[in-house]
């Protein structure tokens, strides 16, 4: 199977998952603890990039998304989502309370306010998701660059 991880990185992660210390892994692999540390750190960085890439892909293919700006009260977000859903003819299978509960658990908020900009979106499987990547609206791109066929 194709992977972003090297065989050594996979082996290090497997051994760490079994509870081994970096020094123990180094002994097993015949390398230094510092090298094991580097392998593990780079593997985890690759995994984080892969997760972010998948989230971005899901966001691009989402049914609906709304931007939430830093300082915005999250109690206003469900109404924004429902309004945009109505405009696009999309059914949101969540209540206001469920959306707020989701935001409290998953979004960068503090005391009802967004700590930074983020996007709330409904993916193709009707799951709510939060992304800190703000994508330009393609309709807006078309307006700024002379038309819809200019991408």
Swiss-Prot record:
MF GO annotations: DNA binding; DNA-binding transcription factor activity
Stated name of the protein: Putative transcriptional regulatory protein TK2151
Gene3D superfamilies, sorted: DNA-binding protein Tfx superfamily, archaea
A Pfam family hit: Sigma70_r4
Function comment: Putative transcriptional regulator.
InterPro entries, per database record: RNA_pol_sigma70_r4, Tfx_C, Tfx_DNA-bd_arc, Tfx_DNA-bd_euryarc, Tfx_DNA-bd_sf_arc, Tscrpt_reg_LuxR_C
Family: Belongs to the Tfx family.
Keywords (A to Z) from UniProt: DNA-binding, Transcription, Transcription regulation
Keyword Transcription regulation annotated: yes
Gene Ontology biological process terms in this record: DNA-templated transcription initiation
Keyword field contains Mitochondrion: no
């Amino acid at each position: 199977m194709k992977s972003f991880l090297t065989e050594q990185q996979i082996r290090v992660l497997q051994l760490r998952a079994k509870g081994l210390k970096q020094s123990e892994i180094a002994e097993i692999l015949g390398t230094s603890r510092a090298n094991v540390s580097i392998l593990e750190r780079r593997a985890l960085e690759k995994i984080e990039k892969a997760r972010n890439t998948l989230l971005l892909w899901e966001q691009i293919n989402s049914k609906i998304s709304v931007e939430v700006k830093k300082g915005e009260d999250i109690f206003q977000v469900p109404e924004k989502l429902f309004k945009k859903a109505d405009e696009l003819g999309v059914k949101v299978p969540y209540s206001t309370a469920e959306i707020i509960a989701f935001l409290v658990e998953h979004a960068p908020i503090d005391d009802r306010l967004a700590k930074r900009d983020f996007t709330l979106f409904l993916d193709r499987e009707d799951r709510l998701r939060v992304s800190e990547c703000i994508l330009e609206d393609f309709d807006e791109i078309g307006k700024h660059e002379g038309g819809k066929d200019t991408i």
